[in-house]
Amino acid sequence: MGIRPPPGERSPAAVLSFGVVNLDKPPGPSAHQVSAWIRDLVGVEKAAHAGTLDPKVTGCLPVLTGTATRIAPALLEGFKEYVAVLELHDDPPRILPDVIEAFTGEIYQKPPKKSAVARRLRTRTVYDLDVLDVDGRQVLLRIRCESGTYIRKLCHDIGRALGTNAHMGHLRRSATTPFDDTDLVTLHDLADAVAWLRDTDDTEPPDAPADALRAAVQPAERALTHLPRLTIADSAAHEVATGAPVYAPGVIDTTALPTPPADGALVACYTAGGTAVCLGRLVGDPDADAGVVVALERVLV
């Protein structure tokens, strides 16, 4: 089984078949709907979004295309960042800063009634909660939190703690590990890039349509940049492609691993050229002479 070329050497078709779109989701359609639109637009069999957004919510929604959908579990590792409008039902009291600070750190949440998960009390971590602006009864918040935090419920609970009651107004996701809103792509951007590539002729600069596509669809390796990484030999990569784990003799570079690496950590393995080969759990010493180092979870080639 062949190993795909390094990210910078792939054809447009190869990028589409193993790519990621950092989509600026518009209000209205569901996350599932925009994923289906992207699937049909780029002409792949499947596409998957990472971290759902409600129809009214806008912002950062990574969409994986083709075989890159195998990467989806890796995007559960990390944080989310939102900008939300807290709509108070009365004038903001003086205790607003103190109440906001009290909701930083570990909090308790019960999923809302319409949630797809069991409504059991659980803990989530709010890493940062900042007031960006106050305009009358509207409070603009920036929230950096653990995946799975319900922002609508957070706004409701803040309102109760303030004694004014409150609900969530507009919500926009500004980041989801490892993506943020600095390089978002709209559906129109993507459609234009795909159309340009398909309709190009000899009068066009030879690389311009492909460059436009690569600006809209990034190699899927972009979705793994937050994970610890191991570099493995090409011979080991070919063995992984057939389902074998990563053995110690096949590891050629560990400099991108944390020191000391945590047992059971999710890691990404690459060739020396930068092609993602697999995701797996670190189960052995990568500096050892023998033994299994990475137990496979997803083969990416």
From Swiss-Prot:
Keyword Transcription regulation: no
Substrates-to-products reaction catalysed: uridine(55) in tRNA = pseudouridine(55) in tRNA
Biological process, per Gene Ontology: box H/ACA sno(s)RNA 3'-end processing; mRNA pseudouridine synthesis; rRNA pseudouridine synthesis; snRNA pseudouridine synthesis; tRNA pseudouridine synthesis
All copies of domain PUA, residue ranges: 227-301
EC identifiers of the protein: 5.4.99.25
Source species, domain of life: Archaea
Active-site residues, record numbering mapped to chain: 54 (nucleophile)
Keyword annotations from UniProtKB, A to Z: Isomerase, tRNA processing
GO MF: pseudouridine synthase activity; RNA binding; tRNA pseudouridine(55) synthase activity
HAMAP family: TruB_arch (MF_01081)
NCBIfam families assigned: CBF5 (TIGR00425), PRK04270.1 (NF003280)
Protein family membership: Belongs to the pseudouridine synthase TruB family. Type 2 subfamily.
Role: Could be responsible for synthesis of pseudouridine from uracil-55 in the psi GC loop of transfer RNAs.
Protein name according to UniProt: Probable tRNA pseudouridine synthase B
Source organism of this protein record: Halobacterium salinarum (strain ATCC 700922 / JCM 11081 / NRC-1) (Halobacterium halobium)
Name of the gene: truB
